[in-house]
Amino acid sequence: MDDNRIRSILVLGGGTAGWMSACYLSKALGPGVEVTVLEAPSISRIRVGEATIPNLHKVFFDFLGIAEDEWMRECNASYKAAVRFVNWRTPGDGQATPRRRPDGRPDHFDHLFGQLPEHENLPLSQYWAHRRLNGLTDEPFDRSCYVQPELLDRKLSPRLMDGTKLASYAWHFDADLVADFLCRFAVQKLNVTHVQDVFTHADLDQRGHITAVNTESGRTLAADLFIDCSGFRSVLMGKVMQEPFLDMSKHLLNDRAVALMLPHDDEKVGIEPYTSSLAMRSGWSWKIPLLGRFGSGYVYSSQFTSQDEAAEELCRMWDVDPAEQTFNNVRFRVGRSRRAWVRNCVAIGVSAMFVEPLESTGLYFSYASLYQLVKHFPDKRFRPILADRFNREVATMYDDTRDFLQAHFSLSPRDDSEFWRACKELPFADGFAEKVEMYRAGLPVELPVTIDDGHYYGNFEAEFRNFWTNSNYYCIFAGLGFLPEHPLPVLEFRPEAVDRAEPVFAAVRRRTEELVATAPTMQAYLRRLHQGT
């Protein structure tokens, strides 16, 4: 029998996507496959931080056998227990602190990790909506149903000093340090070959398959499978394979970002255990806390503001002089390749797809795509069904996220600028419009396969197929003030069940008090982790 096994893989591009690809594929396929990374010699970069989601460690670092504390120390990492949305309901310029809503409450809400508790076969969100819409409570959804918001307010750690986990969390870190760490791990532990050179062109056979890539120094690097991690340039997928790019600007308007890094006094003001998403005149800004500094960037639409205007608004928010700052200006295309796998080329990361980092899905798209690639891994025959199924999986992953992000803008009550008014004119995709109608009718939207965080975040196959769940939709929709039109009708016939839900809400309040009394500050925990003091 002929040996049709893939024997060699060439990854074009380094960065987080390239080195994640090299590590994951080398680990998954073992020493029988030679993995090479072709990376242009490094240039100086402005480091602005990266935010992630909870399954990163289980799906990627655990798979590689790298302990959490080890990679965190190497990558200047801190914890992220939520995304806090600030000023998404009130008009005005970018502001780092919450304004007051008309009801007197501060204009912020939290998108939290972990699944909602259930009561009598319904998620707690439906009981909260019943109480809220019947005037029985005015407490916000996030603070009624989750224990974390009070920890966030007090800048407390999601782990005890002995490492015990108190709540679901993800991470903030320096993305360039992660890429450097994975490069060392790949070369030293997995025998990945690292070639520093500049790509010039690719060779194709009569079938249109890539046979080799060529470099400025005259190298010819042959392989059986090629992974395109060349970023927005999409060198192999877009230029060599000529795969069409599906523009998604009819759903999401933002197409630019201006970013900078600023100092932060951790001892004086503490370290926030969350990513901040701060609404601006023509988009939004992130704030990613790192040790001794934080990264911030204004993601905006060039239809409604200029690069200079965006930089000025960002600097006003942080009370710094634009003339004294070094900015990283980024133009990005919103959308995805029609297919991420064409013949013997697979695009991973930004070369395949991109949405703005509003929900920290950038790295997730990379390692989720790698998971699906290994699941559908080919041999040299490259049977079309493998690529077809992979392409359907990653397209659905992208489209679901695109729709969820669009709702953040479309359902916001803000209408104080051309940008916010324009967002409301964009149509939802048909499938997502149905989800919005389900929510308006009081129904749960996309129930999770389990509410046990250990099993939910521990079973990536189930999580991948059920990624944005009812908990996510309620955090954002209710947080924006977009409530169901009426409670779930069946609860009107079950008053006893509604009454019996009160102890569940009370248990959330008790657990919150317990955590506040025991959790260390983020600053104290990270000092012990990174400095051993």
Swiss-Prot record:
Chloride binds at residues 361-362. L-tryptophan binds at residues 359, 456-457, 463, 467. InterPro entries: FAD/NAD-bd_sf (IPR036188), Flavin-dep_Halogenase_NPB (IPR050816), Flavin_halogenase (IPR006905), Trp_halogen (IPR033856). It catalyses: L-tryptophan + FADH2 + chloride + O2 = 7-chloro-L-tryptophan + FAD + 2 H2O. SUPFAM superfamilies: FAD/NAD(P)-binding domain (SSF51905). Keywords: FAD, Flavoprotein, Nucleotide-binding, Oxidoreductase. The active site is at residue 80. FAD binds at residues 14, 16-17, 40, 50-51, 363. The keyword Cytoplasm does not apply. Its EC number is 1.14.19.9. It comes from the Bacteria. The record marks 359 as: Important for activity. GO terms for molecular function: monooxygenase activity; nucleotide binding. It is an enzyme of class 1 (oxidoreductase). Pfam families: Trp_halogenase. Belongs to the flavin-dependent halogenase family. Bacterial tryptophan halogenase subfamily. Involved in the biosynthesis of kutznerides, actinomycete-derived antifungal and antimicrobial cyclic hexadepsipeptides. Together with KtzR, catalyzes the regiospecific dichlorination of L-tryptophan (L-Trp) to produce 6,7-dichloro-L-tryptophan. KtzQ catalyzes the chlorination of L-Trp at C7 position to yield 7-chlorotryptophan. Can also use 6-chloro-L-tryptophan as substrate and form 6,7-dichloro-L-tryptophan, but has a preference for halogenation at the 7 position of unmodified L-Trp. Cannot use piperazic acid or gamma,delta-dehydropiperazic acid. This is Tryptophan 7-halogenase KtzQ. It comes from Kutzneria sp. (strain 744).
